[in-house]
Amino acid sequence: MEKGFSVGWRIRTTAEFRRIYAARQRIIGRYYLLYYRENEIKHSRLGVVASKRNVRKAVWRNRVRRVVKEAFRIRKKDLPAFDIVVVAKASSVEADNKELYECINKLFTQLEKQSKRSSSV
């Protein structure tokens, strides 16, 4: 299993983020919003947004991002070929790492179900 979060697995440019937001497909969780869009490559990619407006302190923003990246790293082989943007909500500050991890895993599971539903139609 890959340990890192290399460039090929990341969403990096503003244009890519905008394209995903424009698709208007999202799943809402307690601590995160997950936006997604099918991509042309064979694997999923991730972008994480933890804005100063929602998550004030840098330490908190980094923690919120770290949990998402770790959950993605563990499940990336199982996820469908989507570009995924995870946006941290203000409520994420109040949660501990376990709650954040459970929330993002739940969102990833819902994404897998969505993709199976849309591919069977």
UniProtKB/Swiss-Prot annotation:
Nuclease in keyword set: yes
A GO molecular-function annotation: tRNA binding
GO cellular component: a single term: ribonuclease P complex
Superkingdom of origin: Bacteria
Any GO BP annotation: tRNA 5'-leader removal
EC number(s) from the headed UniProt entry: 3.1.26.5
Catalytic activity from the UniProt record: Endonucleolytic cleavage of RNA, removing 5'-extranucleotides from tRNA precursor
Record-annotated membrane-spanning stretches: none
The UniProt record lists the keyword Hydrolase: yes
Keywords: Endonuclease, Hydrolase, Nuclease, RNA-binding, tRNA processing
Enzyme class: hydrolase
Gene3D superfamilies found in the cross-reference section: 3.30.230.10
Sequence similarity: Belongs to the RnpA family.
Oligomeric form and interacting partners: Consists of a catalytic RNA component (M1 or rnpB) and a protein subunit.
Function: RNaseP catalyzes the removal of the 5'-leader sequence from pre-tRNA to produce the mature 5'-terminus. It can also cleave other RNA substrates such as 4.5S RNA. The protein component plays an auxiliary but essential role in vivo by binding to the 5'-leader sequence and broadening the substrate specificity of the ribozyme.
Protein name listed in UniProt: Ribonuclease P protein component
Organism: Coxiella burnetii (strain RSA 493 / Nine Mile phase I)
